């Protein structure tokens, strides 16, 4: 098992914790991470892009002028895709981009993302991350003391923590249940409270 230092909010080491190898020491495969991140981003798409086809555009269906004898190029009705204001050919219509990858693959990708943070020395474990009041300055001071700017911070549900951090750039606070591959990889650092380790074990083992 890997051993990591547990720090307080002043950046001082107060104890150590063991991390299970089955979660924090697995083979990292970029193809698996890519597939899960691609799925997450696809699920976030609104899929509301919409265009009007020839049958949707308002206008007469009458032929503009006779087929032959005018010397001009032949024309159909005003809704022709060739004309300004006409319909769009093969344009987008509202649809869902949602798809899923197997649950085992999603769990494996999460383990890989956590492993990569540990190996890159960008995983910080804190004894607790709580504040007595909602104060952005206090949160920024704690993050700087931990050397974890540009970080994904895992919360144990503390409202003061979430509200103190919501206006800080390049920082995101997530509850442990919302831990996901995309956000772990997006931010340089990952800050975990000690209690979250057991919750992650329960979710992934």
From Swiss-Prot:
Residues 63-73 have a biased composition (Basic residues). GO terms for molecular function: rRNA binding; structural constituent of ribosome. Pfam families: Ribosomal_L4. Residues 43-77 are annotated as: Disordered. SUPFAM superfamilies: Ribosomal protein L4. Keywords: Ribonucleoprotein, Ribosomal protein, RNA-binding, rRNA-binding. InterPro entries: Ribosomal_uL4, Ribosomal_uL4-like, Ribosomal_uL4_dom_sf. Signal peptide: none annotated. GO terms for biological process: translation. The keyword Nucleotide-binding does not apply. It comes from the Bacteria. PANTHER family: 50S RIBOSOMAL PROTEIN L4, LARGE RIBOSOMAL SUBUNIT PROTEIN UL4M. Part of the 50S ribosomal subunit. Belongs to the universal ribosomal protein uL4 family. This is Large ribosomal subunit protein uL4. The gene is rplD.
């Amino acid at each position: 098992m890997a051993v990591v230092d547990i720090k307080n909010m002043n950046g001082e080491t107060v104890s150590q914790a063991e991390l299970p190898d089955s979660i924090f020491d697995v083979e990292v495969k970029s193809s698996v991470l890519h597939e899960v991140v691609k799925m997450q981003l696809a699920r976030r798409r609104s899929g509301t892009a919409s265009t009007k086809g020839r049958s949707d555009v308002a206008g007469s269906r009458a032929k503009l002028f006779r087929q032959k004898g005018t010397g001009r190029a032949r024309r159909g009705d005003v809704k022709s895709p060739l004309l300004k204001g006409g319909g769009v050919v093969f344009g987008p219509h509202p649809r869902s981009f949602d798809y899923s990858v197997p649950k085992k693959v999603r769990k494996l990708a999460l383990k890989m993302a956590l492993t990569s943070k540990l190996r890159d020395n960008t995983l910080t474990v804190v004894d607790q991350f709580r504040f007595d009041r909602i104060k952005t300055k206090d949160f920024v001071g704690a993050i700087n003391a931990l050397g974890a700017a540009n970080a994904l911070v895992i919360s144990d549900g503390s409202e003061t923590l979430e509200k103190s951090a919501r206006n800080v750039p390049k920082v995101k606070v997530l509850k442990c249940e919302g831990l996901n591959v995309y956000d772990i990889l997006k931010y340089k650092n990952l800050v975990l409270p000690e209690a979250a380790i057991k919750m992650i074990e329960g979710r992934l083992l």
